Swiss-Prot record:
Family matches, as InterPro entries: NADH_UbQ_OxRdtase_chain4L/K, NUOK/Mnh_C1-like
Record keywords: Electron transport, Membrane, Mitochondrion, Mitochondrion inner membrane, NAD, Respiratory chain, Translocase, Transmembrane, Transmembrane helix, Transport, Ubiquinone
UniProt organism field: Rhinophylla pumilio
Protein name in UniProt: NADH-ubiquinone oxidoreductase chain 4L
Ranges annotated as spanning the membrane: 1-21, 29-49, 61-81
GO molecular function per UniProt: NADH dehydrogenase (ubiquinone) activity
Compartments, as annotated in UniProt: Mitochondrion inner membrane
Catalytic activity of the protein: a ubiquinone + NADH + 5 H(+)(in) = a ubiquinol + NAD(+) + 4 H(+)(out)
Primary gene name: MT-ND4L
Purpose: Core subunit of the mitochondrial membrane respiratory chain NADH dehydrogenase (Complex I) which catalyzes electron transfer from NADH through the respiratory chain, using ubiquinone as an electron acceptor. Part of the enzyme membrane arm which is embedded in the lipid bilayer and involved in proton translocation.
Length: 98
């Protein structure tokens, strides 16, 4: 395993641990999800370039589009929750009230 793959795997793991540990605030959870998607994008791009797989060259772009959609939906949900309740604590959100 090369140093680049280890760094990307470490970035993904740190983002996953951050998502599991700091899930009380919605903003920190969204930042950790973005870190996970960015490391997946870089790892997928490097893998496709290394094995010269031209048929799957659009796959990282599709992943990046899904990451952008996830970020837009997450930020709009964060704005809605923070204007409605005045905080971004995930524990205080009840699905029965929304």
């Amino acid at each position: 395993m090369s140093l680049t793959y280890m760094n990307m795997f470490l970035a993904f793991t740190i983002s996953l641990v951050g998502l599991l540990m700091y899930r009380s605030h919605m903003m920190s959870a969204l930042l950790c999800l973005e870190g996970m998607m960015l490391s997946l994008f870089v790892m997928m791009t490097i893998t496709i370039l290394n094995i010269h797989l031209t048929l799957a060259s659009m796959t990282p772009i599709i992943l990046l589009v899904f990451a952008a959609c996830e970020a837009a939906l997450g930020l709009s949900l964060l704005v809605m929750v923070s204007t409605t309740y005045g905080m971004d604590y995930v524990q205080n959100l009840n699905l029965l009230q929304c």
